[in-house]
Every structure is written in structure tokens, then in C-alpha cells.
């Protein structure tokens, strides 16, 4: 457990080598990254997966919390582990936390990984937000939830039922408020960090053209990798491809990972 102020964070840690931090999607926990974390650890990286406040054993207040506060949680984890600046990778909502951390605490961030990132300056449209809420509503009929998840998270041919479990609606609502309280212009550029942008091929929230626009805006420090046959839930649809992209990029940051 990592404690800072009145926040206590459960951190799933594995592997040895340079640090890669994995931050999960809106209303979901660090175990979504299980197959990816295993592959990264096997590739000789130290993998840290902090559970967000309210998930697992992590606790902390939500009243008045902004994106900056969630980034401070991750800063505390990296400082506690004391293994040097980290490659901080955020899936979906986690990408904003990663970018905010790189903005506020650049000395802790070797690079930023954006996975299925909605980097636009505006929130998701109402129909998408409604589908996300339905997906996380465990009291709704499974058929309605699967339909919503298929629309907003999964590519054609993928089985959305794999995400029926693992939702934390109260955390989702609190994270959404925290994100809305912080203007997107603040974290947009991820400070001055190098950025790996992992773009799903069929994402209704984060479009391929958004990735290209982001690269044009920030220039050569952005590397875009498109993952075929995937949508917003790319980390569970294509864990091997996502892992391979992360490992290849991490090797450019640390050409010879420490043993």
C-alpha cells in the first residue's frame, strides 16, 4: 500500500527493470491489464498498477477531487517505488491521468502511453456517455449492457460480454466529475514528454483521425501505432498487440533494460 495524505493506494507490482505504470479505464480496475502486465514483466520491466480510489483496497475522498489530485496519486506511487522516471500508460480515462502527471510532475515521467485516448478538447457526446453509464449499471439487464458495450467499447466480431464484470459505477461517476473539473487544455499536451499513441482501428470514442491530428499538433514527439480489429476496449481485445507496441516503444526509452 502507498499512502499520501488521506489516500491509500493498493498497487499491483511485478517484474524487475525500468518502470512501466498502467492506469485503467473509467470505472474499471487495474486487473484489466493482467495479460499485458504479465507480458511486460516477462520482457524485463517493472510493472506498477495502482488501483484507483474506491477499487480493490484503495481508498480516498472524492469531494472536490480534480484530475490533478488523481495524478498526484500516481506521483506518490512512482516516488514510493523509487525506481526512476516511469513510462506511464493510460487506457481511456487513464490517459488523461497520465497526461496530467506528465504536465504537473515531468521529472517522474520518462514517456507517456495513450491507449484508446479521447484527446479532443470536448467531452464525449451524450449518446456515448449514456452507453458508458448503461455498461457500468450492474442492475440493468445483461442484454442492454452488452448492447451498450458493443456500441461504445468493442469492435465488430469481439465479444462484449467479457466486460460484464469489473465495473465500479460510483468510481466511474466520481472520475467523470474529476475529469470535467479540469479543463482539457491543461493536460492536452502531456507536458513535453515523448508520447506513444496506441490507436484502435474501430473506436467510436477515439477516432483514427484524432490520433493524426494529435501528432500534427505536438510534432515528432508523438508516435502513433494503430491496432487492427479493435475498439475502445483494445487492451482486452488485442492484449498481445498492445503489449508488443508498449515493449517496442519502451526499448527505445531504455535500449538495455536493467536486470
Where are these regions (language model features)?
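Gly/Ala-rich beta-loop-alpha elbow adjacent to hydrolase catalytic centers
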Residues: 90-94, 98
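Catalytic active-site module of serine/aspartate enzymes centered on a nucleophile-bearing elbow/loop
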Residues: 221-259
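Short beta-strand/loop motif that positions the catalytic acidic residue
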Residues: 191, 197-199
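Flexible "cap/lid" loop of the alpha/beta hydrolase fold
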Residues: 99-104, 110-139
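Conserved alpha/beta-hydrolase catalytic His-Asp/Glu region
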Residues: 123-126, 138-191
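Conserved HGGG/HGGXW glycine-rich cap/lid loop of the alpha/beta-hydrolase fold
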Residues: 7-57
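Acidic catalytic loop of the alpha/beta-hydrolase fold
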Residues: 202-206
Amino acid at each position: 500500500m502507498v499512502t499520501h495524505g488521506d489516500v491509500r493506494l493498493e498497487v499491483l507490482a511485478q517484474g524487475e527493470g525500468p518502470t512501466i505504470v498502467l492506469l485503467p479505464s473509467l470505472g474499471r480496475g487495474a486487473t484489466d491489464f493482467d495479460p499485458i502486465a504479465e507480458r511486460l514483466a516477462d520482457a524485463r520491466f517493472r510493472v506498477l498498477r495502482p488501483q484507483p480510489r474506491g477499487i480493490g483496497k484503495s481508498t480516498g475522498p472524492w469531494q472536490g477531487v480534480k484530475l490533478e489530485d488523481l495524478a498526484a496519486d500516481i506521483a506518490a506511487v512512482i516516488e514510493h517505488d523509487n525506481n526512476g522516471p516511469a513510462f506511464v500508460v493510460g487506457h481511456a480515462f487513464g490517459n488523461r491521468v497520465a497526461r496530467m502527471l506528465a504536465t504537473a510532475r515531468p521529472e517522474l515521467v520518462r514517456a507517456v502511453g495513450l491507449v484508446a485516448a479521447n484527446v479532443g478538447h470536448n467531452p464525449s457526446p451524450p449518446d456515448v456517455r449514456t452507453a458508458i453509464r448503461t455498461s457500468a449499471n450492474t442492475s440493468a439487464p445483461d442484454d442492454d449492457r452488452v448492447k451498450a458495450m458493443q456500441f461504445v467499447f468493442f469492435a465488430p466480431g469481439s465479444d462484449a460480454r467479457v466486460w460484464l464484470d469489473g465495473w465500479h459505477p460510483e468510481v466511474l461517476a466520481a472520475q467523470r466529475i474529476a475529469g470535467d473539473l479540469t479543463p482539457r487544455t491543461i493536460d492536452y499536451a502531456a507536458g513535453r514528454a515523448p508520447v506513444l499513441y496506441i490507436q484502435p482501428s474501430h473506436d467510436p470514442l477515439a477516432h483514427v483521425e484524432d490520433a493524426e491530428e494529435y501528432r500534427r499538433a505536438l510534432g515528432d514527439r508523438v508516435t502513433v501505432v494503430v491496432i487492427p480489429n479493435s475498439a475502445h476496449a483494445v487492451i482486452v481485445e488485442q492484449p498481445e498487440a498492445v503489449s508488443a507496441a508498449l515493449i517496442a516503444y519502451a526499448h527505445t526509452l531504455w535500449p538495455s533494460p536493467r536486470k
